[in-house]
């Protein structure tokens, strides 16, 4: 009968011996992994293209939500680094009539609609694929016409954000899909999805700011002082629970009318210099010659 080996048990904790061999063979993680900025497991699958699609980029819809802004970018990977095709930001929405609430779900949808129409315009596909003009909150997938070019396809890149149901990231996704972009997705993470099906009315309510309007009414009834403090910018801009939906409808129409980015105006700055400008080589030689000449004249005068 063979004897059992005296191997290490699976549940035993073994301290790492950090000797010379350990440090000699140690390989650090990628810098952005060490900083907790990039999930390389997910990034690899979002960037690697099919092997039968030669030199065809795999486009990603990169969405990042900050405290004061929502950032949406269409990007693809290259060895030199990611290339940004186009981008859209929630801080552009005041140009289309949405001056407040730039980080809520409704603003996320509008930002997605903006980048979707913008990238289609860039590739000359905006007239072929109009997307979902009448927003109803239900599922919508852009179907390619056999006689025409296929619509622009990209994949959602959420980064390290938590992909919970109703997250604003999926508002950008829905706006992009309704713009006419071919983006694979499921309705499971949209607001209003419960018990295996999507409540389109609840989702539409979020797209047009209905949930914000309901909270405004509730807070105004319960605590008017808190309402005036929390919605001071809404009150200043004349936005209330009754006209908030109309504001977003007008914004969607304005985005479809002109999604192109606003041209940057270069600022002319008058440069001020507080120290003496550096003189050129020719000026230095002339200055030395002048000093020498004055010295020689002084010597001759003394003689």
From Swiss-Prot:
Subcellular location(s) of the protein: Cytoplasm; Nucleus
Keyword field contains Ribosomal protein? yes
Major subcellular location class: cytoplasm
Q: Which UniProt keywords apply?
A: Cytoplasm, Nucleus, Ribonucleoprotein, Ribosomal protein, RNA-binding, rRNA-binding
Q: Does the keyword rRNA-binding apply?
A: yes
What GO terms describe the biological role, i.e. biological process, of this protein? ribosomal large subunit assembly; translation
Q: Which domain of life is it from?
A: Eukaryota
Q: Which molecular function term from Gene Ontology is one that the record holds?
A: 5S rRNA binding
**Which InterPro entries does this chain map to?**
Rbsml_uL18_euk (IPR005485), Ribosomal_uL18_C_euk (IPR025607)
A GO cellular component annotation here is: cytosolic large ribosomal subunit
Assembly behavior:
Component of the large ribosomal subunit (LSU).
Q: What does this protein do?
A: Component of the ribosome, a large ribonucleoprotein complex responsible for the synthesis of proteins in the cell. The small ribosomal subunit (SSU) binds messenger RNAs (mRNAs) and translates the encoded message by selecting cognate aminoacyl-transfer RNA (tRNA) molecules. The large subunit (LSU) contains the ribosomal catalytic site termed the peptidyl transferase center (PTC), which catalyzes the formation of peptide bonds, thereby polymerizing the amino acids delivered by tRNAs into a polypeptide chain.
Question: Which PANTHER family does the entry mention?
Answer: LARGE RIBOSOMAL SUBUNIT PROTEIN UL18, RIBOSOMAL PROTEIN L5-RELATED
Family statement: Belongs to the universal ribosomal protein uL18 family.
Q: What is this protein called?
A: Large ribosomal subunit protein uL18
Lineage start: Eukaryota, Metazoa, Chordata, Tunicata, Appendicularia
């Amino acid at each position: 009968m063979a004897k059992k080996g005296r191997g290490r048990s699976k549940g035993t904790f073994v301290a790492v011996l950090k000797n010379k061999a350990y440090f000699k063979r140690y390989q650090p993680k990628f810098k952005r992994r060490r900083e907790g900025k990039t999930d390389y497991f997910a990034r690899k699958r979002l960037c690697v293209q099919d092997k039968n699609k030669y030199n065809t980029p795999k486009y990603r819809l990169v969405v990042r939500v900050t405290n004061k802004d929502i950032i949406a970018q269409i990007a693809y990977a290259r060895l030199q680094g990611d290339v940004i095709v186009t981008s859209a930001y929630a801080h552009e929405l005041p140009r289309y009539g949405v001056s407040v609430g730039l980080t809520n779900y409704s603003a996320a949808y509008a930002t997605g609609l903006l980048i979707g129409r913008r990238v289609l315009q860039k590739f000359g596909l905006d007239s072929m694929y109009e997307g979902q003009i009448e927003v109803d909150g239900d599922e919508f997938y852009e179907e390619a016409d056999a006689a025409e070019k296929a619509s622009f396809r990209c994949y959602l890149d959420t980064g390290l954000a938590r992909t919970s149901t109703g997250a604003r990231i999926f508002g950008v996704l829905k706006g992009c899909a309704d713009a006419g972009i071919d983006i694979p997705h499921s309705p499971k993470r949209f607001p209003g999805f419960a018990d295996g099906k999507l409540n389109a009315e609840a989702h539409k309510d979020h797209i047009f700011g209905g949930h914000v309007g309901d909270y405004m009414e509730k807070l105004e009834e319960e605590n008017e002082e808190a309402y005036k403090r929390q919605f001071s910018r809404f009150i200043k801009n004349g936005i209330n629970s009754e006209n908030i939906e109309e504001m977003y409808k007008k914004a969607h129409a304005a985005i479809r009318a002109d999604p192109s980015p606003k041209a940057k105006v270069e600022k002319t700055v008058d440069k001020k210099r507080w120290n003496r400008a550096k003189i050129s080589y020719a000026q230095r030689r002339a200055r030395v010659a002048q000093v020498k000449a004055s010295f020689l004249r002084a010597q001759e005068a003394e003689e």
